[in-house]
Structures are given as C-alpha cells and as structure tokens.
From Swiss-Prot:
Native organism taxonomy: Bacteria, Pseudomonadati, Pseudomonadota, Gammaproteobacteria, Enterobacterales
The protein, known as: UDP-N-acetylglucosamine--N-acetylmuramyl-(pentapeptide) pyrophosphoryl-undecaprenol N-acetylglucosamine transferase
Binding of UDP-N-acetyl-alpha-D-glucosamine, residues: 15-17, 127, 163, 191, 244, 263-268, 288
Function: Cell wall formation. Catalyzes the transfer of a GlcNAc subunit on undecaprenyl-pyrophosphoryl-MurNAc-pentapeptide (lipid intermediate I) to form undecaprenyl-pyrophosphoryl-MurNAc-(pentapeptide)GlcNAc (lipid intermediate II).
Matches recorded under SUPFAM superfamilies: UDP-Glycosyltransferase/glycogen phosphorylase
C-alpha cells in the first residue's frame, strides 16, 4: 500500500458476538497495512479485550433503552445526542476513511457521527434478525451485509467472521474418519452457562449410559453443581469445566454439540463442520431461533425451543443418530458455512473507503 495507510474505525461492543467478528476483520486489514482504532464503551467487554489485541480504543457513553423505564426514555434523545457528539469528536481526530459497525449500542451514535462527517458506513449484521440499531443505521449506511439470509431483504449474505483456529480444523470427513466408541457430546452454555443445559444434560446422560461421553462447559460458578448433578445420576465420569479456553480443540474432539444458538456459535459450528442440537435463548424477537434455522433446514442440526428441550426428547434424538448420520450432518454443516466471511467483509470495507 503506497502513501498513508488507510484508516478504519470499528464500532462494536457489549458481547463477544459483536466484538470477536470485528477483531477478525480488524486483524485481517491490519495485516494489509491498515491503521485501526475501535469505538466502544468503557464498561463492557471490549474495554479490556480490544487493547489486548494491539488496537487502540476510544470510548463513548451509551447504553440500551429496553426496560429502562419512562425517565430513561425521556432522557434518551439527550443521551444519544451527547454520545453522537463524543463519537463525532473522536472521528474528527482520527479521520477514518471508513467505519465498520459490527453491532452493539455504540454503533448507533458512532454510525450517525460518521455519516454526518461524510465517512462511508459499512454495517454487518451477525444475527438472523436485525437488531434495532442496525435496522435504523441501514437507512444511512453505504453498504449493509448480513451473516444469515433474512435480516435485510437486499443485503449480501457474507457469513460471520470466525476465529482462524476454527477455520483451520480438518474437514469432517477427515476428522471423524475411523472414530468409534461412545458418541462425544460437547455441551456449551456460554460464559454465563445455560441453566436449562446444566439441569437437563446430566439426566440425559443417565438415560444414554455408556453410549455417550460428555464434555460439559457449565459457565461461571456452576461447575461443582453440574458435577454433582452428573454424579447424582450415576454418571460421574463425564468432564465438567467452567470455561473452555480452546474452543477449536473442543470442536475437534466432539461428534455433536448441544448449545445455545448465538450468531457466532452457530457460525463456528458450521465452519467446524459439526452437527448440533440448538436450544435458542427465549427472546421476544426469537433472534437465536432464526440464527439456527439455516442449519436445521440444511439437515445439519435440530432445534429444540426451550419448552421442548426435555430429557426424553434430547435422549431419543441423540440415541437415534448413528455415527454415519452424524458424519452426514457434519458435512452438511460445513457445506453451508461461509469460511471466507472475514475476507468478504474486509474486501467491502476496502472497496468503499474514501480515497
């Protein structure tokens, strides 16, 4: 790249589902010589995580409005205006050639500030149904991309950027070749765990006996309780950990995953090439259900809404999947993944950047 390096400001915050895809794109462009800064909030995960990746971060003050009450709603216009003013001042100093909104409340005032300064705005929607911030920002964005079809009617489907170690896993037909013995079930509840998984899966293990071996990620503070639940059903041999630091290794070990269906989780499971039982988090817009639906439609997964996630239903489903069936599902999952999502998003950022 000749002359001054291109400048990108990534706007993302709140959850790993927003931050990790943004980091993937940021690192890809930094490797090409881009200068990258981040716009976030000081009290969410990006404040600690982003600097650890060698990226400078600026903060604005903004939070969500749902469930905040009448006073908060009345004060919202002033809060949004102040956040917009803060973001605008930050962008006037940094002078980005393009901004990338990856979701979270910070993207709203950040995107509006960029638009008011004539800076191209690129949006990426990670979920199968668009969040309120991105629905609004799509009206002023230069480009809108989506991970799953349906969030925006005319947006290009580019997938979710996922970690390179997951993308580097051997294909299912290589990884699973010659496996025998008990079916390996990976249970993932996220960093906070998922109570319904923690309560149900030990009883599922009791029904399935020695036909399965389970690695159960319980979430913070729940490891002992879940270990006791397995022991209480006569299944103390299963592995329970509070966290899993190396998810790529866990995916490589597993034959099937039982988990929530956050956008990044679904995309990682598809990229790894794994069958799944998805238990969407119950939310009024059914966001996690729509994330998982493409994999179920492809014959790569089974969705259980939480009321249907019973011991009997899950045990019967797992018992009915042979190793041959699981391999077929794994290949279908990999076939619908978009492994070059990071490159696709980065390419669009490069295309629309100011020259």
């Amino acid at each position: 790249m000749s002359g001054q390096p291109k400048r990108l400001m990534v706007m993302a915050g709140g959850t790993g589902g927003h931050v990790f895809p943004g980091l993937a794109v940021a690192h890809h462009l930094m490797a090409q010589g881009w200068q990258v800064r981040w716009l976030g909030t000081a009290d969410r995960m990006e404040a600690d995580l982003v600097p650890k990746h060698g990226i400078d971060i600026d903060f604005i003050r903004i939070s969500g409005l749902r469930g905040k009450g009448v006073k908060a709603l009345l004060a919202a216009p002033l809060r949004i205006f102040n956040a917009w003013r803060q973001a605008r001042a930050i962008m006037k100093r940094f002078k980005p050639d393009v901004v990338l909104g990856m979701g979270g409340y910070v993207s709203g005032p950040g995107g509006l500030a960029a638009w008011s300064l004539g800076i191209p705005v690129v949006l990426h929607e990670q979920n199968g149904i668009a969040g309120l911030t991105n629905q609004w920002l799509a009206r002023i964005a230069t480009t809108v991309m989506q991970a799953f079809p349906g969030a925006f009617p005319n947006a290009e489907v580019v997938g979710n950027p996922v970690r390179t170690d997951v993308l580097a896993l051997p294909l299912p037909q290589v990884r699973l070749a010659g496996r025998d013995g008990p079916i390996r079930v990976l249970v993932v509840g996220g960093s906070q765990g998922a109570r319904v998984l923690n309560q149900t899966m030990p009883q599922v293990a009791a029904r399935l006996g020695d036909t399965v071996t389970i690695w159960h990620q319980s979430g913070k503070g729940a490891q002992l309780t879940v270990e006791q639940a397995y022991a209480g059903t006569g299944q103390p041999q299963h592995k329970v950990t509070e966290f899993i630091d190396d998810m790529a290794a866990a995916y490589a070990w597993a034959d099937v995953v039982v988990c929530r269906s956050g956008a990044l989780t679904v995309s990682e499971i598809a990229a790894a090439g794994l069958p799944a039982i998805f238990v969407p988090f119950q939310h009024k817009d059914r966001q996690q259900y729509w994330n998982a639906l493409p994999l179920e439609n492809a014959g790569a997964a089974k969705i259980f809404e939480q009321p249907q996630f019973t011991v009997e239903a899950v045990a019967d489903t797992l018992a009915g999947w042979s190793r041959e069936a699981l391999l077929t599902m794994a290949e279908r999952a990999r076939a619908v993944s978009i492994p070059d999502a990071t490159e696709r998003v980065a390419s669009e950022v490069s295309r629309v950047a100011r020259t």
